[in-house]
Amino acid sequence: MGNLRVDVITLFPEMFSAITEYGITSRAVKQGLLQVICWNPRDYTTDRHHTVDDRPFGGGPGMVMKIKPLEDALVSARQATGAAAKVIYLSPQGRKLTQQAVKGLAEQESLILIAGRYEGIDERFIEAHVDEEWSIGDYVLSGGELPAMVLIDAVTRLLPGALGHVDSAEEDSFTDGLLDCPHYTRPEVYADQRVPDVLLSGNHAHIRRWRMKQSLGRTFERRADLLESRSLSGEEKKLLEEYLRERDDS
C-alpha cells in the first residue's frame, strides 16, 4: 500500500475539486500520496455540440452515454497511467462498497473510475472495459461523481501518512467489522451532561475495554447484520452482554 493515482472519466471534472482542494484528500494530494486526474468524454467528440449521449434502443425515458467518447477517454487515461489500472464503474447494479472492499482497492497503484450520467452507459462499454462495478447504497443519484468521490475519500484514508494520527484509520467504524464508539471532547460537562468517567481516568486498559463494549453495543442496536457475519470472541461476547445489562438497568 503506497501512493495512489486515480483517473476519473466524468462529464463534470469540476466536482472533483471537493477531493483535491479540501480536507484529508487535499492534504494527501499536496503530500504526493494521491493524484486525481479527470478526463471529460466531451473532449473526445467530433460534432459541434460535443454529444456524449443518445436515445436508448427499444425506447424508454432518458438518454444513454455513447461508447466512443467513453472509450477514447479511457484510452487516454490508460496511456497516461502507464500501468494496468483496474477500471471501476460506479453503478447501482454493482456490489455494495464495504470497508473490506476499500482495503483491497487501497492496495492498487492506480484506479480508473467511470462516473456515468443519464440512464447509464452503453452496456457494451461495460462488457469490454470494466473490471468491477461498485455501488455505495440502494438509492438513486444523478450520476457517478459522488460515489466516485466517496470511494476516493475512503481509499485515501488507508494510504500511509494520509491521516494525522497513525491509529485513526484503524479505529474508524467498520475497520474491524463494528461501528465506532462514542467520542467526546472538552468541556467535561455541557448542559448537565458529563463525559463518561472512564475516559477521564487515564487508565488505558479500562478505556480500551469501554470503547470496545460501546462499539459492540452500538453495532448490536444499530447494525445487527454486521454481527451476523462476525465471529465474536469470548471476551467480546462478555462485553456485549455487559452492555445490554447496563442498558436495561439504566
From Swiss-Prot:
Keywords, sorted A to Z: Cytoplasm, Methyltransferase, S-adenosyl-L-methionine, Transferase, tRNA processing
Single biological process term from Gene Ontology: tRNA N1-guanine methylation
Catalytic activity: guanosine(37) in tRNA + S-adenosyl-L-methionine = N(1)-methylguanosine(37) in tRNA + S-adenosyl-L-homocysteine + H(+)
Top EC class for this record: transferase
Major localisation: cytoplasm
InterPro entries for this protein: Alpha/beta_knot_MTases, tRNA_m1G_MeTrfase_C_sf, tRNA_m1G_MeTrfase_TrmD, tRNA_m1G_MTases_N, tRNA_MeTrfase_TRMD/TRM10
The keyword DNA damage appears for this protein: no
Any one GO cellular component localisation term in the record: cytosol
NCBIfam families: PRK00026.1, trmD
UniProt-listed PANTHER family: TRNA (GUANINE-N(1)-)-METHYLTRANSFERASE
Name listed for the protein in its UniProt record: tRNA (guanine-N(1)-)-methyltransferase
Species assigned in the record: Pseudomonas putida (strain ATCC 700007 / DSM 6899 / JCM 31910 / BCRC 17059 / LMG 24140 / F1)
Lineage: Bacteria, Pseudomonadati, Pseudomonadota, Gammaproteobacteria, Pseudomonadales
